[in-house]
C-alpha cells in the first residue's frame, strides 16, 4: 500500500508520539478501512478511513510546544491510573492532548517540553540533533576530583556505558528555589542523552547521592524565566533549533 507509515500519520495527527502510535497499533486499537492495522503498514489519510479506538482520525491540529518547570512530585506522563499528579495538569492545553517529549523521574525537577506534535518530538529526541541536557545537581557527600574524573571518563552501568560530558561547581539558576537546610554541594553537569535515572546512577557508582536534580537546559532551550510550576509557549525559532527543521 502506498502512502505514509501509519504510526507517522497518527503522530502527525497529535494522538501520540511515534512510539506511542506504534503501541496503539500493537494493542489492536487502530483500524484502516474497517480492518485491524498491522505494525509497519502504510496508509493514505486522504483516501483511507483510519480509526483509533473507534474514532475517525481527523486533520492534524495546530502544533503546540510548551516549556514547563516541573516541580518535584509530579509525574512526567500524560496520565496515571493511580491518580497521581501529572506535569500536563500544570498547563493550559487548549483542549489538545499533550504529552512530554522526554521524561524526568518523579523526584526530579526542572525543564520539560510538552507537545502534541509527535513527529517533531521524535526528531528532537533523536541523538543526531545533539540536544544535550544540563542539570543542576545537589550531591552529598560531595564527590572527589578523582570521582568526577572517573564519571567524565565513563563507567559501565547495567544498561551500557555512560559518562558526564562535563561537571563543574556552581549554584542552580535563580529560578530554582533553595532551602537553608539543604546539604551537599551543587554541581552543574552535562549529559548527552536522557536515559532512565542516568545521573543518579552515575553518582551512586562513586558513593554519592543526588539530593536534588534540576534540569536547566535541553539543547538551546533553558529554564530562564520559569519558576516552579510555570510554563510558556516556545517561539518558532526555539522549536526549529531543537529539531533542525521547521514545525508544522
For the regions a protein language model found, what residue spans apply to each?
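Basic, flexible Lys/Arg- and Gly-enriched helix-loop patches that mediate nucleic-acid binding at interfaces
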Residues: 1-248
